[in-house]
Each structure stands twice: as C-alpha cells, then as structure tokens.
Amino acid sequence: MSAGRQIFIEFVIQGNVAKATAIDPASGIEACVMGPANAPKAALADAARRKLEFLMKKKDGN
C-alpha cells in the first residue's frame, strides 16, 4: 500500500476475545484478526494492517 493511503481500524472486544478489523475505504476490502482481549491494541492493529496489505496485493495479482 502507498504511504498516503487511509486505513480504518476497528476494535470489538467481547468477553476475553478482541477482534481488530482493518478497512481500506477506497476499495472496501476488510481484513480481520482475533486475539486475546488483553493483547496490546497496537499489536492487533498491526496484524490486521499487514493482513489487509496481503489481501490487497493478492487482489492486484502481485
């Protein structure tokens, strides 16, 4: 992804599980990761962002 691209990160915590979703608003592609609720939000956000980058590259055929 380009350095200037906007990404939204959403967190949902339910019980002892946290779900982080990275969303690219330009394409509408979403990537979700799950982890323990006590995991650092930065770690979950980074994992979701990396998964989103992977999915976007896969979609582009690279």
Regions found by a protein language model. Give the residues of each.
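Amphipathic, hydrophobic secondary-structure cores in small proteins
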Residues: 4-59
